Regions:
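Short loop->beta transition adjacent to catalytic acidic/histidine clusters or analogous donor-positioning motifs
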Residues: 5-7, 28-41, 50, 63-66
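N-proximal low-complexity "stem/linker" segments adjacent to membrane-targeting elements
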Residues: 1-29, 36
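Conserved donor nucleotide-binding strand/loop of the catalytic core
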Residues: 38, 52-86
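Hydrophobic helical membrane-anchoring modules
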Residues: 1-6, 147, 154-155, 178-260
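Acceptor/aglycone-binding surface of glycosyltransferases and processive sugar-polymer synthases
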Residues: 70-86, 91, 103-184, 211-220
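A conserved acidic beta->alpha catalytic loop
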Residues: 44-53, 99
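Acidic helix N-cap motif at the loop->helix transition within catalytic regions
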Residues: 18-22, 49-58
Length: 260
């Protein structure tokens, strides 16, 4: 009988044939050294290149790799949601295929998840470091978005969009079952839902490196992201979100912020 994975690691992908194979090998090499069972779920968000073919070849060699394929491009939020609802691990984490945050961060994240419902990587607080910065205009827009989302959603976290996040499995499934935003602002929505329902959000400072080959269209995606934040408030005000049940077996009511 196959063991239940200790962790399900999700990687959303869209047209990633040029860097997927190399970074997939890095992730598998890291996970293969672990004493626990794991699964690596690659979500192909309607790619038009050979992304799925690359994953299928890897999965034929490594049985712990799974491919989840969306027929058409729906957005990062929709891809992560699909992956979470398909995951079987005790813990669920996701990161970006560019590995802008080192895969080794998963070790600390899993430790922190012993006492927190949600752990998020942040690059804008004490203890974090940026090895290679984004262009100034992108950093500026990121700061504006963080302030805007914190004010509108009353969430108050240091950073929303760092790609590395982890959850206790049942918490992830509850939050992502409720989550509705398909695009880039899904991070803010999930953290809003977590805070709204009393789950602890632990901020872990990370070392981050900007990846030049981004698929973000700064003007289009900025406008859509700002609209999505208002949409989240609209959904909440008019009762579109289902009630997320609290987990009684752990006390996640007090926020814990890691300074490691």
């Amino acid at each position: 009988m196959k063991k239940i994975p200790h962790v399900s690691l999700l990687i959303p992908c869209y047209n990633e044939e040029h860097r997927l194979s190399k970074n997939l090998n890095k992730i598998v090499k890291f996970l293969s050294k672990k004493p626990y069972a794991w699964e690596l779920i690659i979500i192909d968000d309607g790619s038009k290149d050979k992304t799925s073919d690359i994953v299928s070849r890897q999965a034929a060699v490594e049985s712990s790799i799974r491919l989840v394929k969306l027929k058409k491009n729906q957005g990062k939020g929709a891809a992560i949601r699909k992956g979470v609802l398909n995951a079987t691990g005790n813990y669920i984490a996701f990161t970006d295929v560019d590995l802008s945050v080192s895969i080794e961060t998963l070790d600390v994240m899993l430790t922190l998840l012993q006492s927190s419902a949600v752990v998020i990587g942040v690059r804008r607080r004490k203890g974090s470091s940026i090895k290679k910065h984004q262009p100034l205009y992108r950093e500026f827009m990121g700061h504006i978005f963080t302030k805007y989302a914190n004010i509108v959603l009353n969430v108050w976290v240091s950073h929303f969009t760092c790609g590395f996040k982890g959850f206790e499995s049942s918490v992830a499934k509850q939050l992502f079952h409720t989550q509705r935003v398909p695009g880039w602002s899904f991070d803010a929505e999930v953290l809003y839902l977590a805070k709204r329902n009393g789950y602890a959000v632990c901020e872990h400072p990370v070392e981050w490196t900007n990846e030049e080959n981004t698929k973000v269209n700064i003007l289009r995606d900025a406008v859509l992201s700002f609209i999505d934040i208002l949409r989240i408030r609209y959904y909440s005000f008019f009762g579109y979100y289902e009630s997320v049940e609290k987990i009684s077996r752990k006390n996640y009511m007090t926020d814990r912020k890691s300074t490691t």
